[in-house]
C-alpha cells in the first residue's frame, strides 16, 4: 500500500471508443413480435431503434470499443496499467471480460484486469474505481469499458422491457489529472423495481416495474441535480449538457 497523499487526484478522459452490432431492430420490427407499435414506444420512451447481436457478444463488443479508444489516444499500450469492464451480461463466469480484452489488445501480463457488475450504474462505478486506483498506484492510464448484450436476457413478449434495451459497448481511456472530474454525489436506489435473476436461473429475463422506475426518476432527478449544483457552487445556467439514463422522455425533458 502507498503512503496517503494530501491531494486527491481527479480524472481526465483521453479518448473514447464504441462498438455496435450490425443488426438494427426498429420499433416496427418489434411490433411484429409483441403487442406494440412505433407510436406507443416513441411516446413513452423516445426510442426509435436499438442494436442486437447476431454474430457478436459482450466480449467482442468490449474488445472493439477498447481497441478504438486506444487507437484514438495515440498512447503506448505499455503505459496502460489497468482494464475495468462494467457489465451485467458477461459471456463467462471466468475468465473475466477484462482479462480477455487485456489479451486481445496485447497488453502486458501484469496489467490489472477485472469486471464489475452494477447494472445501469456500472460505468460510473468503474470511473470511481479508476480514480481510486490513480490515487493508490503509479498507473499512467486506465482503460474503462461498458459492454452489454442485453438481448440475451430480454423477454421479447414483454413490451415493458424489450423495447428499452439493446446491445453495444463504449470505452474510455483515462488518466489522472488535478482539478478535473471527480465524484460529487450519490443518490438513493432500489433493489426491487428492476431485476434480472441471472443467466441459468429459472426466470432469467429482465423484469421491471416501469411505473415505479418512472416515479423514482421524477422524484429523485431534480433533487439530485440541485444537490450536485449546490456542492459544485454552480447554477443550471452553467451546465451545457446533462447525461441521463432514462426510460421515458418525460424525465429527460
Task: Enumerate the predicted regions with their spans.
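Conserved small/polar residues in nucleotide/adenosyl-binding loops
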Residues: 246-253
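Short glycine-rich phosphate-binding loop at a beta-alpha junction
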Residues: 79-86, 238-245
